[in-house]
Structures are given as C-alpha cells and as structure tokens.
Amino acid sequence: MDQGKLYGVGVGPGDPELVTRKAERILRGADVVAVPDKGAGEKTALHIVREFVEGKELLCCPTPMVRDRSLLDGCYERIAEDICALLDQGRSVAFITLGDPTVYSTYIYVHRKVLARGYEAELIPGVPSFCAVAARLNTSLCEGAERLLIVPA
C-alpha cells in the first residue's frame, strides 16, 4: 500500500471567499482533515472551510496557546504520530491553518516532524491576514523600492 500525503492548507484570514481554489480542491479530496484546537473547542479554521469538508473524518489536534516549549513540542509530536499513522494507511490528510502555513503557523512544527520521518508533505499557501487587512483598507503594503517588514506583536 502506498503512503498517504500530508497537506498543510492555509485557509486565509476568516472569509470563506478568500480560501484559494487549490485549498478547496485539496480539502474536498482529502480523506481526513486535521483541525487545530486551541482549547475550549475553538476551531476557527474549521468554521472557515466547513462547506468544503462536510462529511469528512476530522482529526482533532490540541494546540494550546501556551509558551511552554516542552508542552507544545509534546503536542506537536502526538499530532505528528497520529497523522503518520493515517499516512501509513494510505490516507491523505489536510491540516488546516489560519492565514498561510508559512507565516506564524502552528502547522509548520507538525510539518517538520512528519517530513523528518520520511513522509511526503506539501504546503498550500493561503491569504495572510496582513494582506487581507491592506485590501480591506484599499491600500498598498509597499510600492516600488519600499521595503516590507513584518514584525510579530
């Protein structure tokens, strides 16, 4: 049996209309959708894409909003183990994440762990919030020779 593939899918800043066509295609085709849960049942990313994943098997991925690196690493390790077990069954897994998976995303830690174990994984970009805000304000983030610097809050 062939191994499945993991997709880290950016679902944008919150508006379902900003989910890319590629993200929608990957989500509709995935066997399992991995859903980050920050606690208290908060699954914002799932609410954004619910129309694309209706009836899909969901894998709840506890990702508490804490600064304890050892606790977080343990969570990411367990999530990676669960995902790899699904990949070993030949199933495809789409891990949804707000914005873009390469910009301050919880997903990237799981991505690295899965890749380190020899599995195939692909990043599916999404609209990052800072781009959505600029569009909402009808303004440019930078032009010509200007530089753009993104600094965490």
Language model features: what each stretch is:
Residues 1-16, 21-24, 28-120:
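Class I S-adenosyl-L-methionine
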Residues 102-153:
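Class I SAM-dependent methyltransferase SAM-binding "motif I" and its flanking Rossmann-like core
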